[in-house]
Amino acid sequence: MVNESQLVEVIKQAKESDKDRKFKQSVEMIMVFKDVDVKKGFAINETVQLPKKTTKPASVCIMASGDMGIKAKNAKADMVIDENELTKLSADKKKSKKMINKYDFFLADTKLMPTVGKKLGQLLGPRGKMPTPVPFNAPIESFLERFRSSVKIRAKGSLSMSCRIGEENMGDADLAANASAVATAIEKTLPNGSKNLSLIHI
């Protein structure tokens, strides 16, 4: 288990050793694994909600039509794509890739999921961005809030992973809380938990 107080010290040292810059830097967390066989299908594909808000929330695209599409727009989703737009995108692979790479997370009306899978599944799947289904009566605002404060963590064929846990102007304790949330979530996916964790670098 990762000790949060130790993470605070690691973050302090990282900030002190870094040169002053005129722009806000993202704070990245790197985890290195050991004693796992990447050739036997070891992979991580996790979404982790950070407990402390960052100044740069994740971008969320919602695929929905009708009432849910209107609710998504009213909730100020970063992008709302209806069924007609999905069909247009599926005919333009270059435009589809650009759109998919632009957003961190995708949500979709449960009724649209089969269409999304058929039209864009081959592009969304390999990128780990298949939409999370949203039931018709679900509170869109709650879904948006959860995913905007989340990070996507992927590792395939590699003994390391990295993700953004915040920005340097955040407090050390807040950054440590986010780092701890990520570490705890990833440990649960490892065959032997923390024993498979070799290094944490921030």
Model-derived features: positions:
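OB-fold/S1-family RNA-binding modules
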Residues: 1
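Interdomain regulatory linker/hinge segments that flank or connect interaction modules
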Residues: 6-17
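Short, surface-exposed beta-strand/loop "edge" segments at domain boundaries and coil↔beta transitions
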Residues: 70-71, 171
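Glycine-rich phosphate-binding loops that contact phosphosugars or nucleotide phosphates
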Residues: 73-78
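Long, charge-patterned amphipathic alpha-helical coiled-coil/hairpin "stalk" segments used as oligomerization
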Residues: 81-190
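C-terminal functional extensions of proteins
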Residues: 191, 195-198
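Conserved small/polar residues in nucleotide/adenosyl-binding loops
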Residues: 200-202
